From Swiss-Prot:
<dbReference type="InterPro" id="IPR029048">
    <property type="entry name" value="HSP70_C_sf"/>
</dbReference>
<dbReference type="GO" id="GO:0051082">
    <property type="term" value="F:unfolded protein binding"/>
</dbReference>
<dbReference type="InterPro" id="IPR012725">
    <property type="entry name" value="Chaperone_DnaK"/>
</dbReference>
<keyword id="KW-0597">Phosphoprotein</keyword>
<dbReference type="GO" id="GO:0140662">
    <property type="term" value="F:ATP-dependent protein folding chaperone"/>
</dbReference>
<dbReference type="GO" id="GO:0030150">
    <property type="term" value="P:protein import into mitochondrial matrix"/>
</dbReference>
<dbReference type="GO" id="GO:0031072">
    <property type="term" value="F:heat shock protein binding"/>
</dbReference>
<dbReference type="Pfam" id="PF00012">
    <property type="entry name" value="HSP70"/>
</dbReference>
<dbReference type="GO" id="GO:0001405">
    <property type="term" value="C:PAM complex, Tim23 associated import motor"/>
</dbReference>
<dbReference type="GO" id="GO:0005759">
    <property type="term" value="C:mitochondrial matrix"/>
</dbReference>
<dbReference type="GO" id="GO:0005737">
    <property type="term" value="C:cytoplasm"/>
</dbReference>
<dbReference type="GO" id="GO:0016887">
    <property type="term" value="F:ATP hydrolysis activity"/>
</dbReference>
<dbReference type="GO" id="GO:0044571">
    <property type="term" value="P:[2Fe-2S] cluster assembly"/>
</dbReference>
<comment type="similarity">
    <text>Belongs to the heat shock protein 70 family.</text>
</comment>
<dbReference type="GO" id="GO:0010918">
    <property type="term" value="P:positive regulation of mitochondrial membrane potential"/>
</dbReference>
<dbReference type="GO" id="GO:0008566">
    <property type="term" value="F:mitochondrial protein-transporting ATPase activity"/>
</dbReference>
<protein>
    <recommendedName>
        <fullName>Heat shock 70 kDa protein cognate 5</fullName>
    </recommendedName>
</protein>
Amino acid sequence: MLRVPKFLPRLARQAGVVPSHMSGASSMFRNLPGASNGISSQLRYKSGEVKGAVIGIDLGTTNSCLAVMEGKQAKVIENAEGARTTPSHVAFTKDGERLVGMPAKRQAVTNSANTFYATKRLIGRRFDDPEVKKDITNLSYKVVKASNGDAWVSSTDGKVYSPSQIGAFILMKMKETAEAYLNTPVKNAVVTVPAYFNDSQRQATKDAGQIAGLNVLRVINEPTAAALAYGMDKTEDKIIAVYDLGGGTFDISILEIQKGVFEVKSTNGDTLLGGEDFDNHIVNFLVAEFKKDSGIDIRKDNIAMQRLKEAAEKAKCELSSSQQTDINLPYLTMDAAGPQHMNLKLTRSKLESLVGDLIKRTIQPCQKALSDAEVSKSEIGEVLLVGGMTRMPKVQSTVQELFGRQPSRSVNPDEAVAVGAAVQGGVLAGDVTDVLLLDVTPLSLGIETLGGVFTRLISRNTTIPTKKSQVFSTASDGQTQVEIKVHQGEREMANDNKLLGSFTLVGIPPAPRGVPQIEVVFDIDANGIVHVSAKDKGTGKEQQIVIQSSGGLSKDEIENMIKKAEEYATADKQKRELIEIVNQGESIVHDTETKMEEFKSQLPAEECEKLKKEIADLRTLLANKETADLEEVRKATSSLQQSSLKLFELAYKKMSAERESNAGAGSSDSSSSSDTSGEAKKEEKN
């Protein structure tokens, strides 16, 4: 255990410095109008390492979005289905096929136990967390305790996946979409996370990018990204609030925009508050209403519950633009009396009463963010609404009451975060040179000291990157080692905060308590990820770690998941190639049979029989296309194509010869007729 020595006053011994390349950046840019040029040249210098396009990805709870810089503008890229956002769903079919996005969401009703959604709410979390336990009751798939204590998901065939893996499958889909659009391999990305994500969740998101084969250059906060999207083409200086209520999380950030410098003043939020919770409240209401009308509790009917969830989401969206909607679900379930249907009306006012407590939960974080930023609501020049839930009229009116002004609709709530991520990607690549982003750490960081007290080294809303140190000492006589327990949170006792990880500094020479001097250094990088070191100043012995969660993914686990992701990518490619060659084979069979019928009088019977056998052989292969060998199908298809071309070439030659023969005979007859006619005319003349 460590103690803060009395002879080393904490404030006197605490140093707060940013890395040399950022030193003084915050104050310098607040006071010097022309200073952005210095930063621009600095960013250009740093960008030399980044080669190729940098894509911006909003990895959302409900939907994900992708953007890339084209010149000075960010462009949202449509996926293969033609949509600008992709559902954050991953499913595994009975035959082992992996589906991502809309194809996965479409089959969720009939395959709910193997369709994974909203896994972002599990990422970087422990299975025993009370929040996870509460969430599990609303999920259609199984959540299990991994060997490291984290919350993982399990399919019906017993395979388990970490939330980082599921996130990686979605990121792989975004990567493929970008590569198809740019027509070049893509490696670099900026990925967004909720501002209130802790270190474990940020690290797990970065792991997801690594598993997907991406080099995640930066992890940035979603509200900050939205502010970048908003402020890219704005020239006036102002303080803005970003109210971000998405599918699974809520964030509020206060930023000051001044001559291209985006400085986050404060951030707050709730990582378990979003559209999923709104949907669950509606589902609970529908279940209760159905039980009241029919006497049937349908909670154990997975298909019925999945249909209710879809209906709840649809009704919620419709009530943003209309006062009332009908929920009609025929054949929802069966009982002894026969099929039971659901048919009820849901009004906007009823919806607002159902979710009123959820909307109220966003108020306190907003007030706290204003207080931490030392800004009054009258100083807020603009309030940006981000996230699909901000389309709800009640949410908009709550924001208006809270900030005393009409919220702005100048950014697309679904796309702004991805656009901002692309802008930051442009900054890192050196394509955007007039923007500097100064973000903050959302939660205080510190260590456990004598008596279980949480001693802060870095307070919340400190601009990052940052580095701070403090000297501690031993808590007992003759102590030769100390355990450094790193926590994150705002409570005064360490156990009430999130334990990020721990390590031990050994080899301290025995001495009376309070004599050894142990310097603990916290270093937070631009991604918000924590690096911690401890050094015995007497011996010079040092121990350092990059904080993973006390569970988290090990290097070996990440490498194994990368390998599995590559295997899935290979399998997907082979499956796609097989489908393409099967389609080609079926097309050639159809065309060959059509032409054989059309030219049967011109084709040798013996050759036709050979061709029919080849068609029959290929048909047999195509009938078992799920298990067919790709090369075998390709070979048979190519053989039939070559044989049919040769045969039809003979037919065309034969037809051509016949036409020429007929044309020659016709010409001879015409000439003979002409001569006879001439002789007759001569006789008449005579």
